[in-house]
């Protein structure tokens, strides 16, 4: 490997300062979503006595209101949505159970090639590993699906925008995963497949480094890679 023209990082000699956060969708897993009918049916079943069309109208009204009132980076979590819908339709759903039902009814996760080996590399080098995802589902729900695909022993924390209330690239999202990992921002790396949210945002926030997965324009000097499997090649134990 020619490191002369490549971005290169040394593993911090203090293992307590080693942390790496990853985006989820498109980075660690590909999500196969159910069709819209499956999604709506899973949602309608939570309000068995209501007319599905009324449920749909209220859902659209509330989500439109939330976006116009709070802007695109403020997350509307499933738990907040369910709390509102319960109040309108006089139901009493267990929001965590309902989230699990909805997510498992509408999502199938497929590991990205090279993701497990990359996570294992950083785990073997003493890194604490986190996931930060823009999703309306709580991190505890998402973590269950990541465990199902075999990542349970490789991930320490899962933080979602539903937990934080803000979506990437808002600083609150990055701050939440850094805090959950128990490190300072300058000790944490980030990787993902979206330039603004996963590459530029973490750098502006002050993370130690970030990597963009984009097969169309790999550039080792900038930390842009064609595959998640390339990321460990930027790290060395010593000069």
Which residues are covered by each model-predicted region?
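N-terminal helical cap/lid subdomain that shapes the substrate entry/recognition surface
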Residues: 3-121, 125, 139, 238
